[in-house]
Amino acid sequence: RTHLDSCDFSLGNYSAVTDPQDKEFKTFSLARDEKYILPYIRLAEQYAGHKIGVMLTPWSPPAFMKTNNDRNHGGKLLPEYADTWANYICRYIREYENRGITVEFLTVQNEPHATQTWDSCRYTHEEEREFLEKHLYPALQKAGLEKIKINLWDHNKERLFECASTCVTASTNAMIDGFAFHWYSGDHFDAVRLVREQYPDKRLIFTEGCIEYSFRDKDQLKNAQIYAHDMIGNFNAGMNLFFDWNIVLDEKGGPNHVSNLCDAPIMCNPNTKEVEYKLSYYYIAQFSHYVLPGAKRIAATCYTDKLETVSFVNPDGTFVVVLLNRTEQCMPVTLRIKGSLVACEIEANSITTIVCAAKGAAID
């Protein structure tokens, strides 16, 4: 996931076009992306050994397209610029693809119900639906970009169902790939589950969850547990994909042009070249390393609610069970899969992943 134009974690506000008269985007420039973003996507693909599908998310239209003439502090998209903004988004996608970057997902707006001191823009559910239906999707079709998977909401979970029930209509259903959500208002796993049950064909994607220094301490164990708890709860409720935001920050928790500094799984000091892998990095790896692309979550039961668990079956037939123990006591577990038993103990304040072969014999 990366930002279309600037976001709070940019070095400052910027837009690819700043001239209100440039409706044809002749001055369109991706210079900032070319310098600070695209090289890292290319490096990630190099290390992964395959192409990576990118999610593009706008935090705000250019200032001149908004009611407050400001990228920051909320405001709304001016109606007369709706088509221009839709075409701007299409141009951004095309510029990425012209540079060899695959844009797979697009969200309409980051946190559309929030007025932030940084890049932000407000939409009601009805306004987001109207922009999608009458402006964005037609523009994508005209540009030959209808393959892009559009996800709505991209905000906290507690209003996820409200967004889905408002935005999915007979005319928009085929336009909507799914819904994106954040964790800032609490667990709300039932909201995720409700959307999964009512809209089983829609993708559910976690797109953002920062550990803000202004609200939380720097306790590595607590922060790692926040990640694992949310991932387990969301996966059990029907989540399909998890994006970390941000996986890498500098030693201060930035850069961030409004000092909204945060913790991250990987912290780097650009001056000393030191890299610190936080405990949260290894907690996330319990999922990302063992749960393979194409895996399916499977049903499982547990004898106590003091142990948080989620189970998957990989495309190769292996079973993966992730167990999170946030208590101060060691928890005994006997894992039963297809008649085979594996006994183990889950240490206090720990996360454990068990991988079993298709027939139930433990292999890791």
Predicted regions and their residues:
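Residues that line or immediately flank small-molecule/substrate-binding pockets and catalytic motifs
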Residues: T2-L4, N110, H182-W183, N246
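Short catalytic/ligand-binding loop motif for oxyanion handling, primarily in non-cytosolic enzymes
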Residues: S6-F9, P62-K66, A114-T115, R159, ...
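Substrate-binding and catalytic surfaces of secreted/luminal carbohydrate-active proteins
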Residues: V54-L56, N87-R94, R99-E104, T115-D364
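Short, histidine-centered active-site or binding-site loop motifs used for metal coordination
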Residues: D70, P112, C210
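N-terminal catalytic cores of secreted or lumenal carbohydrate-active enzymes
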Residues: R1-V103, T124, K134
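Active-site loop signature of alpha/beta-hydrolase-fold enzymes
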Residues: P62, E111, E212
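Short, conserved phosphate-binding/catalytic loop or strand-edge motifs used
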Residues: V108-A114
